[in-house]
Amino acid sequence: MIAGMAHNTSPLPMTATSSHRWHEFLDNIASLLPAGTAAVVVDGPGEQPGIVADCLAETLRAAGRPCWRPAGTSPDAAAPAAGTVMLADGPAWRTARDWDVVIWLRAGHAGHGHHPGGEADAGIVIDLHDPAWPVIRRVAGPFASRGRWYISETRAFFSTRAATWDTKFGDDLPAYSAAIAQARIRPGGVVIDVGCGTGRALPALRQAVGSDGTVIAVDLTPEMLRHARVKGRAAHAALILADARHLPFASASADAIFAAGLITHMPDTQAGLRQLARITRPGGLLILFHPSGRAALAARHGRTLEPDEPLAAAQLQRSTAATGWHLTTYDDAECRFLAIATRQ
């Protein structure tokens, strides 16, 4: 069935690497589903929801979980038997009942919620723009702590983009430099770039703290750090492979945290902010940055802004206040996003 997925949605043959990605991806979804009886629906454009549901059913059965795939496109009051996963697909099924888990596929030109329902209330959101390389992109709060999905799915997403990451964003290094200069990081201090990617901020961070300061760059994806080294950015910082949810630093050890695009990729915003607060000294800085404003970034991805997004002004004000930070700067311009908070 996995080979059929590639055959039905892509002219490219399924390689051993992409087959492994599919198996890992399906195992991760299976680990996110509730134990015991569960009603699950897969939705999205075209025929892909049915194919993904078939593949997931095979994975569940292989793991010893009873799974029922209801037939037809005219739902009735069907309910799963005790201990069984009911696995349906398509918009008709999605609107037929309440579901324990809604899985939404981003694919083609309709990946960001142009269909009724979309991903707004989905528990699991999948990027399937490349049928040979599926990736879990978002897991809603009730499901986020389940399974082992976060590390492998994050690496799967970013590893294939590392080589072209700098090209994708163009010449935006001056925007990094301007944001870091505005933050006024203490010279001689310790600054940690969490989620550093290819290290685009590292030259400006080194300039901010000077030769007597310490710059540490952390990322979860080995390929991102490798490209940071290729571009010579390891000369500005120590590069460390680590998970931003469990940073390997002592409490109150940093004077400033820089994070470009990190918060929107974390499964639990407040837990992530709390971890950043743990390693920051009282009075230290949190600098949240993106070289595009929120509206411009949303338009690029074909979606509209929602008031409950992690970086929305009111939402960020609440989450920083709840995790030991005081938000002092919030600038969501078209050309950049910059928020600065002080550790309480």
Predicted regions span which residues?
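Conserved class I S-adenosyl-L-methionine
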Residues: 146-187, 200, 204, 227, 287-310, 315, ...
